[in-house]
Amino acid sequence: MTVLTDKIAVVTGAGSGIGEAIATLLHEEGAKVVLAGRNKEKLQNVANQLSQDSVKVVPTDVTNKEEVDELIKIAQQTFGGLDIVINSAGQMLSSKITDYQVDEWDSMIDVNIKGTLYTVQAALPTMLEQSSGHLINIASISGFEVTKSSTIYSATKAAVHTITQGLEKELAKTGVKVTSISPGMVDTAITAAYNPSDRKKLDPQDIAEAVLYALTQPSHVNVNEITVRPV
């Protein structure tokens, strides 16, 4: 028996990169996985590599609260419960404050901050009612280390980290666990557009393994935060 047998997991941003790696690993470990993201074709490509009776594709824009509410509802209707939610959907745009690209600021705030909050608020009532569940938010080292071109992105990821810290305090003694995972540079299509190829990067699988570590601790242990860097 694998370690997550019959656990029901929702993964946002599951069509590629970190989200795809997380969803695939959780499925390999026995979880029933709901794949969420904007691009239905990419989600279906991921699903086609998994066992069809334990995977569900739900195209979802995390900036739309109604779609996120429906995502969680479909997950419960399809598999009969909800145990794990991974907020992996994210957007990284190189946008300085002095560039005045307000539309880019709004987009990153909507995806990275509001998307995380919408998913949490949709999943929490069920988890609180059953006194169990695990929320994992993918933050970033950029939330702690700001470059001249990452101010807004870094601010949104700092917010994700702070949201997770606050949730951990709010949910203490409820049985619901909360974890923030802050990766360094990860080799994905998003980072390829902004970073030199010779810079050391993590593999998306490295982040998936960190997620699995947090999920497989004893019931009395909550891993509050994990930082993952390339060496």
Curated annotation (Swiss-Prot):
InterPro entries: NAD(P)-bd_dom_sf, SDR_fam. Its EC number is 1.-.-.-. Signal peptide: none annotated. It is an enzyme of class 1 (oxidoreductase). The keyword RNA-binding does not apply. This is Uncharacterized oxidoreductase SAS2370. The active site is at Y153 (proton acceptor). Belongs to the short-chain dehydrogenases/reductases (SDR) family. The keyword Oxidoreductase applies. Substrate binds at S140. GO terms for molecular function: oxidoreductase activity. NADP(+) binds at residues 10-34. Keywords: Oxidoreductase.
